[in-house]
């Protein structure tokens, strides 16, 4: 790889490839008599993966309500019924007068 890169650089500089090849062959190659220490055995540690939480809607992530398990949803009402609460009168309807038995 280095030789290829050097050839490209030499060609870009305008040097002849023959002169460049002569320079590279005269450099001594590293001897194989040197021994390298064996690389230490690496241990791979596995990460503990947590269970993925259940997916929630975006609004549910932001707004946490304290709701009871048995709380019922309120009845749906018309918009006018929400605005105008009716007042209940506590008057009982008048009873007809009792007729004496004849």
From Swiss-Prot:
Posttranslational mods: Proteolytic processing gives rise to the active protein.
Basic residues biased stretches: 80-90
Inducing factors: By high environmental acidity.
Keyword Transport: no
Keywords, ordered alphabetically: Periplasm, Signal
Skewed-composition ranges (Low complexity): 21-41, 91-102
Domain of life per record: Bacteria
Family, similarity comment: Belongs to the Asr family.
Protein known as: Acid shock protein
Protein's gene: asr
């Amino acid at each position: 790889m280095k030789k290829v890169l050097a050839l490209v650089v030499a060609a870009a500089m305008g040097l002849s490839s023959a002169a460049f090849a002569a320079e590279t062959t005269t450099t001594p190659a590293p001897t194989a008599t040197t021994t390298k220490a064996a690389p230490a055995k690496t241990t791979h540690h596995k990460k503990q993966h947590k269970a993925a939480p259940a997916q929630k809607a975006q609004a549910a992530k932001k707004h946490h309500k304290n709701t009871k398990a048995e709380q019922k949803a309120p009845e749906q009402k018309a918009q006018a019924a929400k605005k105008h609460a009716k007042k209940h009168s506590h008057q009982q309807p008048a009873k007809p007068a009792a007729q004496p038995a004849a």
